[in-house]
């Protein structure tokens, strides 16, 4: 069984074809600059060999048509017919309050996703365009929506309700939603499997640390809290996002500094985080390199990042009544031994002892705690596309 995964952005489309018989990637690619100059398709096969097609691509429907034709192309394709694709799994950013799990797409689902677009104006409209395009080009294929927010649908009210006028929640659905849910779900299940434990018996903290970053508390297989909120801006500092700040800073910027609301949003989303603090880059590799050369602001950016992660881990341990395993994933979490060491140092009093030799691992599944550590720590490479494929297979029941 082969599942096609589609992830549509406003001017891009990522895709991956997965063979569910062995859960291996067959091929993956991206269509870039849709509707813009210099649009192109870049595809990589399982040997990481590249195929590049440069041509005008005016919209997402044309992009998906090109993807499908490339998949069956005699020279660079990997299947003989589109009939070999069993179903399509779509990454959808926001499922609102209604969808706390993945769902087979129909008109009612699409209508609700359109209503949710006000909650994710940069993402949901593009996701819907991709769904419509696939339905038009593959009318007989079942389509499944897998939501970034869904895994956090188990948050209790005390975790997701903000301490603001309750009418703002009732009338406008302003609450914590959380994001990166597909990643948090995948790595939590993967670490339980690796440990040979039933996830229902575990208390897990998952740290998805990349240019976007979030941390989740997972108890008995259900997410009970997460750091991102109404939007992906909330939580810990990230590459360019501020994370949590005092809300009064916003009117201060408008009234005293002359910012427009658009400029405030631009600053907090694209000019803050470790980029804003360091003045160096939003790439943690560049910041670590600068810090190693005694750049004080770069070191400060890292110190704040690590401090805020530790604060959230501590909070989640208290609210879960303990923790069995802490997981690091995504670009920084998987590839920065320095970040992991700083986040886990001096935790022997809790029963967690890091193995510095094991912690040198990059990008591979590995335990990084000492053998006798009561609390375990792992690096688990995320695989959101495989999680989407698994959810798709589960729903279509084939």
From Swiss-Prot:
E.C. number(s) listed in UniProt: 2.7.2.1
Entries under PROSITE patterns matching the protein: ACETATE_KINASE_1, ACETATE_KINASE_2
Cofactors named for this entry: Mg(2+); Mn(2+)
Reactions performed catalytically: acetate + ATP = acetyl phosphate + ADP
Gene Ontology cellular-component terms listed: cytoplasm
Localization terms from the record: Cytoplasm
Binding site for Mg(2+): 7, 384
Co-factor: note: Mg(2+). Can also accept Mn(2+).
Example GO molecular function: acetate kinase activity
Keywords: ATP-binding, Cytoplasm, Kinase, Magnesium, Metal-binding, Nucleotide-binding, Transferase
Protein name (record): Acetate kinase 1
């Amino acid at each position: 069984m082969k599942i096609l995964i589609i992830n549509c952005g406003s001017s891009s489309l990522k895709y991956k074809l997965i063979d569910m018989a062995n859960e291996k990637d067959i091929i993956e690619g991206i269509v870039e600059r849709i509707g813009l100059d210099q649009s192109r398709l870049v595809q990589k096969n399982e040997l990481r060999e590249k195929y590049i097609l440069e041509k005008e691509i005016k919209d997402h429907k044309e992009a998906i048509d090109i993807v499908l034709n490339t998949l069956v192309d005699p020279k660079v394709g990997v299947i003989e017919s589109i009939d070999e694709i069993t179903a399509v799994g779509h990454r959808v950013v926001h499922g609102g309050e209604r969808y706390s799990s993945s769902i087979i797409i129909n008109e009612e689902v699409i209508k609700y996703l359109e209503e949710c677009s006000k909650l994710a104006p940069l993402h949901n409209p593009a996701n819907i365009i991709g769904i419509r395009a696939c339905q038009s080009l593959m009318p007989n294929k079942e389509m499944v929506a897998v939501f970034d927010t869904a895994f956090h649908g188990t948050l209790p009210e005390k975790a997701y309700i903000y301490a603001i006028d309750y009418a703002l929640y009732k009338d406008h659905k302003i609450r914590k939603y959380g994001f990166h849910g597909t990643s948090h779900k995948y790595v939590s299940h993967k670490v339980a499997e690796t440990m040979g434990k039933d996830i229902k018996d575990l208390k897990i903290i998952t740290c998805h640390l990349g240019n976007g970053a979030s941390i989740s508390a997972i108890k008995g297989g259900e997410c009970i809290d997460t750091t991102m909120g109404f939007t992906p801006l909330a939580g810990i500092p990230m590459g360019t996002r501020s994370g949590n700040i005092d809300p009064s800073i916003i009117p201060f910027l408008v009234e005293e500094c002359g910012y427009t609301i658009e400029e405030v949003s631009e600053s907090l989303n694209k000019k803050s985080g470790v980029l804003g603090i360091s003045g160096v880059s939003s790439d943690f590799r560049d910041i670590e390199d600068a810090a190693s050369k005694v750049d004080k602001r770069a070191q400060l950016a890292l110190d704040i990042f690590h401090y805020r992660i530790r604060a959230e881990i501590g909070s989640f341990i208290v609210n879960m009544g303990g923790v069995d395993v802490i997981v690091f994933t995504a670009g920084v979490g998987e590839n920065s031994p320095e970040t992991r060491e700083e986040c886990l140092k001096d935790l022997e009093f809790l029963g967690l002892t890091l193995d510095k030799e094991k912690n040198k691992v990059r990008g591979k599944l590995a335990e990084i705690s000492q053998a006798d550590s009561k609390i375990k720590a792992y690096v688990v490479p995320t695989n959101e596309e495989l999680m989407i494929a698994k959810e798709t297979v589960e729903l279509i029941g084939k």
